[in-house]
């Protein structure tokens, strides 16, 4: 039975409505899937960025912490060096004061003569040379000549050797030195410095640990003194 035009139109409309509905459902399905994928991708990107931000700030925090440690270490070292400089300045000041006080020794002729006797004898015993040269300040020549005369028999008694001692009148110690003597071998290759300044310097070096301990107390980081 042939369909009338009206029936054909109805079928066409019905088919078109079905197709449109199916298309709409398909579109909704595509939209839903697209939105789901978008949300998943957005979540992934957000998480990735969050991790990057966390990593960045963790790195920054570590850098800041490292900088703080470096700054603290620098400040501690600066403070330690400042204390060491202050201590060294104090020791230098005390040693300079001691050197100034050495000048008072020579103002006591009797005491200074006894000291020269010992310094000359010590120089002879350290050299153990048959001929020695003694140098002193010009103003000490008389005292040193006397010291030499007393030192020779003592030297001979101790060393069982003879010695010829020449007090140098050509080359002398500077007049502004504190005092004492320098004792040379005859070829002047060996010298014993027994000036008051050199004796003070030697003594201060030998006694520096005790000096530091007396001034600043025992060093907690040092178990023994060298």
UniProtKB/Swiss-Prot annotation:
Origin: domain of life: Eukaryota
Keyword check for Ion transport: yes
Keyword terms of this UniProt record: Hydrogen ion transport, Ion transport, Transport
Pfam families cross-referenced by the UniProt entry: vATP-synt_E (PF01991)
Cystine connections: none
Keyword Ubl conjugation: no
A cellular-component GO term for this protein: proton-transporting two-sector ATPase complex, catalytic domain
GO molecular function, one term: proton-transporting ATPase activity, rotational mechanism
Assembly and interaction partners: V-ATPase is a heteromultimeric enzyme made up of two complexes: the ATP-hydrolytic V1 complex and the proton translocation V0 complex. The V1 complex consists of three catalytic AB heterodimers that form a heterohexamer, three peripheral stalks each consisting of EG heterodimers, one central rotor including subunits D and F, and the regulatory subunits C and H. The proton translocation complex V0 consists of the proton transport subunit a, a ring of proteolipid subunits c9c'', rotary subunit d, subunits e and f, and the accessory subunits ATP6AP1/Ac45 and ATP6AP2/PRR.
Entry function: Subunit of the V1 complex of vacuolar(H+)-ATPase (V-ATPase), a multisubunit enzyme composed of a peripheral complex (V1) that hydrolyzes ATP and a membrane integral complex (V0) that translocates protons. V-ATPase is responsible for acidifying and maintaining the pH of intracellular compartments and in some cell types, is targeted to the plasma membrane, where it is responsible for acidifying the extracellular environment.
Listed HAMAP family: ATP_synth_E_arch (MF_00311)
Family: Belongs to the V-ATPase E subunit family.
Protein name: V-type proton ATPase subunit E 2
Organism: Bos taurus
């Amino acid at each position: 039975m042939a369909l009338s035009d009206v029936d054909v139109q109805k079928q066409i409309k019905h088919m078109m409505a079905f197709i449109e509905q199916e298309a709409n459902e398909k579109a909704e399905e595509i939209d839903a899937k697209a939105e789901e994928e978008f949300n998943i991708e957005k979540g992934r990107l957000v998480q990735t960025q969050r991790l990057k931000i966390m990593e960045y700030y963790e790195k920054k925090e570590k850098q800041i912490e490292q900088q703080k440690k470096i700054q603290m270490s620098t400040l501690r070292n600066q403070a330690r060096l400042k204390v060491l400089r202050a201590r060294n300045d104090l020791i230098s000041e005390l040693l300079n004061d001691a050197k100034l006080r050495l000048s008072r020794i020579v103002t006591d002729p009797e005491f200074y003569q006894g000291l020269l006797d010992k310094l000359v004898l010590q120089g002879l015993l350290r050299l153990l040379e048959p001929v020695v040269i003694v140098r002193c300040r010009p103003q000490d020549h008389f005292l040193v000549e006397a010291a030499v005369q007393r030192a020779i028999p003592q030297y001979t008694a101790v060393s069982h050797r003879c010695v010829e001692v020449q007090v140098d009148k050509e080359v002398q110690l500077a007049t502004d030195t504190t005092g004492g003597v320098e004792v040379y071998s005859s070829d002047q290759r060996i010298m014993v410095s027994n000036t008051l300044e050199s004796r003070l310097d030697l003594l201060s070096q030998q006694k520096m640990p005790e000096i530091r301990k007396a001034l600043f107390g025992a060093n907690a980081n040092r178990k023994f003194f060298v």
